[in-house]
Swiss-Prot record:
<keyword id="KW-1133">Transmembrane helix</keyword>
<keyword id="KW-0472">Membrane</keyword>
<feature type="transmembrane region" description="Helical">
    <location>
        <begin position="109"/>
        <end position="129"/>
    </location>
</feature>
<keyword id="KW-0812">Transmembrane</keyword>
<feature type="region of interest" description="Disordered">
    <location>
        <begin position="1"/>
        <end position="48"/>
    </location>
</feature>
<protein>
    <recommendedName>
        <fullName>Putative uncharacterized protein DDB_G0280391</fullName>
    </recommendedName>
</protein>
<dbReference type="GO" id="GO:0016020">
    <property type="term" value="C:membrane"/>
</dbReference>
<feature type="compositionally biased region" description="Low complexity">
    <location>
        <begin position="1"/>
        <end position="39"/>
    </location>
</feature>
Length: 141
């Protein structure tokens, strides 16, 4: 009888230990790997983490060499070949608010010049047509 009680106590202790282990596995930090991970957690870990270029330079993680740029995945560096560096510079400039404002000013300035030129040509052509076609008195010398 005493032996059975000991066995029951041992079984209860083992069950409690198993429950504790299960609870620990469920609360295991998502940054560590575990065999009890679900595929959803693994997929979430494999997604890219995009870090701004300025931040990468600040951390000395971004190294530009041979026209290559690097982006960081948690455990690996992915290298992207930038074939045309001029295109890359243009895209950087196009997102710069100062450059955008300058482009708007230049565009509006040229539009105004073109409109003024068209108006002058239209006024000149109207005056010439009236003077030559109808021979108004104020047109002749």
């Amino acid at each position: 009888m005493n032996n059975n009680n000991n066995n029951n106590n041992n079984n209860n202790n083992n069950n409690n230990n198993n429950n504790n282990n299960n609870n620990n596995n469920n609360s295991y930090d998502s940054n560590h790997s575990s065999s009890s991970y679900t595929s959803e957690n693994q997929n979430r870990e494999q997604q890219f983490v995009f870090i701004p270029e300025e931040e990468l330079e600040r951390q000395s993680l971004l190294k530009k060499k041979d026209n290559l740029s690097y982006s960081i995945n948690k455990d690996e560096i992915i290298i992207i070949n930038n074939e045309d560096e001029n295109d890359q510079n243009q895209t950087k400039d196009s997102t710069n608010p100062i450059v955008l404002r300058a482009k708007k000013v230049v565009d509006s300035f040229f539009c105004k010049i073109i409109l003024v030129f068209i108006c002058l040509v239209a006024i000149y052509s109207l005056v010439v047509i009236k003077c030559d076609g109808f021979h108004f008195n104020h047109c002749s010398p």
